[in-house]
Swiss-Prot record:
Keywords: DNA-binding, Homeobox, Nucleus, Transcription, Transcription regulation. The SR/KY and BELL domains are responsive for the interaction between the TALE/BELL proteins and the TALE/KNOX proteins. This is Homeobox protein BEL1 homolog. It comes from Arabidopsis thaliana (Mouse-ear cress). One of its GO terms (cellular component) is plasmodesma. Belongs to the TALE/BELL homeobox family. Residues 197-213 are annotated as: SR/KY domain. Residues 234-251 have a biased composition (Basic and acidic residues).
Amino acid sequence: MARDQFYGHNNHHHQEQQHQMINQIQGFDETNQNPTDHHHYNHQIFGSNSNMGMMIDFSKQQQIRMTSGSDHHHHHHQTSGGTDQNQLLEDSSSAMRLCNVNNDFPSEVNDERPPQRPSQGLSLSLSSSNPTSISLQSFELRPQQQQQQGYSGNKSTQHQNLQHTQMMMMMMNSHHQNNNNNNHQHHNHHQFQIGSSKYLSPAQELLSEFCSLGVKESDEEVMMMKHKKKQKGKQQEEWDTSHHSNNDQHDQSATTSSKKHVPPLHSLEFMELQKRKAKLLSMLEELKRRYGHYREQMRVAAAAFEAAVGLGGAEIYTALASRAMSRHFRCLKDGLVGQIQATSQALGEREEDNRAVSIAARGETPRLRLLDQALRQQKSYRQMTLVDAHPWRPQRGLPERAVTTLRAWLFEHFLHPYPSDVDKHILARQTGLSRSQVSNWFINARVRLWKPMIEEMYCEETRSEQMEITNPMMIDTKPDPDQLIRVEPESLSSIVTNPTSKSGHNSTHGTMSLGSTFDFSLYGNQAVTYAGEGGPRGDVSLTLGLQRNDGNGGVSLALSPVTAQGGQLFYGRDHIEEGPVQYSASMLDDDQVQNLPYRNLMGAQLLHDIV
């Protein structure tokens, strides 16, 4: 009846497997009588059912029957007597104990093994490199040889026991085949996780080192694995350090706009650096122009707003915008200036060196700075174009660029060509020479260049002076303006304005004073003439050089000479009638004769004005 219920639950798909298993179990009795073949049949039975989760135990420790197995047999054999059931549990040689993984269907098997084959234990290993060496042994079913001496059971009891065993095996097959696919997928998933796990290789190494469970690897393979691990660790560390450095550089560039990561400018050529610098300078000029345009537009907008609102009304609104935009433009300017400085350093123009030179060097001029820059550019050109001096031409003296720099300094300080210690140090640094070489060059230059030039200049000056002495007619003999403007207290004008100041002088002294005061010798004519030569009274006449056409004398000023009694040279107004100062007016017209008294009043002041 239980067998009919079992077949009611199974489908047509498992009928073939059931027939095969029935045939195998029916041949079980034959294998018991032939002990040499029972091992082969046992492998066939439990090899086909190894995936069903069956565990078969042949240990000698299980001589005592399990109570669950006895209860199960008691449930299926209720019609049998107590004596028959006990005889089945104790004396049956073909019964088997079958224990499922889930402990659902326990059964009894023979608890004795053949004496000629010892039992083997269970060996586990996590190694995946050499699975054949893992000593995991499958359980085998080895029924005990029938002891024909003490066996007295009948055929019916054996047939019932065989049917019972067959029924349990088929039920186990049907139960585990339904879940076969799910278990297979779950097993593959866990196998993939174990294979790809990073703990697999350390576990294998530990097992091979301490347990030696079938993992046989050569020392070379172990060393290769360790070397690969070290390389991976180094690569990971390098990646971490580079990642952290990139993050730090990004933070620094975000905080400060002027600081930036300088590109490898040394790999660029000289012409590319020049183009880069020119482009950056043009961008800086464009930035300044746009910033000025923005400020102009803001000023216009603020003026329009203030015209509508009032003075100071736009400052509240434009201050924030102006501050933000000025910050933006300043950041851009700092970035461009940083790029220009980096490019200039790549070109060899070191601003720090130039600044130190400008502070220390007292005689440096813009011309020398330009010369230094030109020499640096020429040097870079030579380095790029590989234009070197010919090896077969020996170098005589100092290098040409050094001599050019020293000569330029000499001409800049021509009046005092004696460099100080600081100047020598700077020139030695610029030219690449030593201080002794710079000093020796200046000593030789002062003798060979500077001294001949000074002597030539002195010779030219002396030659011009000799030409002036030998040819006086070629020289302009006009008096100097200072000599004409000079006014002394002993001059004629002072005597006329102050007639009593010089009353005590004699005639000789008066005559010499007049001659010394009015020096008209430069005009080429005799300025002072005595009236005694042309007139009976001997008056003094002063000819001013205004000649008439007929060759006679011009305008003359007649002064009465001093009397023998020591009288005065000039008389007062009360004595004018006795000895007046007479003016000859040979060149005066009739109209001018009428104005003669006014001229008499003016006296010598007119003469001073004419002069």
